[in-house]
Amino acid sequence: CHRPDIDTPIEETVRAMHNLIVQGKVLYWGTSEWSAQQLTEAYAVARAHDLTPPTMEQPEYNLFRREKVEAEFLPLYDLFGLGTTIWSPLASGILTGKYNNGIPADSRIALPGYEWLKARLESETGKQQLEQVKKLAKLADEIGLPIHHLALLWCNANPHVSTVILGASKLSQLKDNLKALDSKSKMTPEVLEKIEAIVQNKPEGPARFGQ
């Protein structure tokens, strides 16, 4: 269920998904960008009426967007066995380093309809992130990785991440991204600590539901 529908009761959504499973049309169902509060309600409804709850949530997760996966959802992993299928691991391409020296003419941000992304990149926060990307690129180079592999492996190192969605637009990009798995051993505790020292944005703890 892609994005919560505030006009539809969660019980109705859970029943609809359960019926699809009973009919054999789908095997499982999940959510995307739901809050911890909405997920908790979905599980409560499923348990109360003997229905099938969602088995996964699809949140945005990368080195610059960490709150949901690392804080808000933290109580849900053990409580419900929730898994996450995360999207935008490269932060819309920012973590590839291709925007470090400006916006390439053939990049996504240069396309019509992506003015919002350009504005975000050119904001003060965006400028700070680009400086962090440069430092991350230096670290990646020191351990023999391209920066986008570093960013992907960082996501994969989180035990609460079940699947990393690769937003590749070309077959060559997909093959290259998958090669990151050959370097999993390079994501050591020491490297993770160095990454934290660069981004300095680790969530402090579980957030309140809905925040």
Per-region residue spans from a language model:
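Histidine-centered active-site/metal-ligand motif
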Residues: H2
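Short secondary-structure junctions and interdomain/linker hinges
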Residues: I143, K202-P206
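Short, hydrophobic secondary-structure boundary micro-motifs
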Residues: V164, P206-R208
